[in-house]
Amino acid sequence: SAVLRETGAEIIELPPLEAYPDSVFVEDTALCLPQGAILMRSGAPTRAGEVAQMAPVLRGLYDEVLEISGPGCIEGGDILTTGREVLVGLSERTNRAGVSELAQLIERWGYRLRWIEIPQGVLHFKTDCSLLDNETILSTPRLAASGCFSDYRVIYTAEGEEAGANAIRFNTLVLMAAGFPKT
């Protein structure tokens, strides 16, 4: 959080949820857009209670908070919002029913959704890609090989540095873990 604070970002720190050790991955619980937030429905039973903990926080920040009601499941780690569309990867944690419900919810805000088949063995879509700017995506070669980014500029991770594709963009700043010098 120190790096984000240096950019001028306002950081909201939440108390740890001991019953949910994966709750540190807060992006999985909600999709936050300028128009409002959408609470996700986790595909992992061990994470099912996280959304209920995050909901009051988001309701305090957004005028409109919608919710994936099911039966489908979807997690934020499978969602990449670009300048022109919302890309969603189908994974072990995100299925077609969840994606369909999300498409219906974001349509009211003017967003178009496109789903992507992600390679086997990839936990989340954004494990293998990040948005660098509205038209440029940092991607592993294995994900980009599907053609899912054919309408974008793509920068590929170097061989052996696939984990470097998981970066965080904040306004015009891209934060990336150290240890990926070629990428």
Which stretches of residues belong to each language-model region?
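The feature marks the mature, well-folded catalytic cores of soluble enzymes
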Residues: 1-183
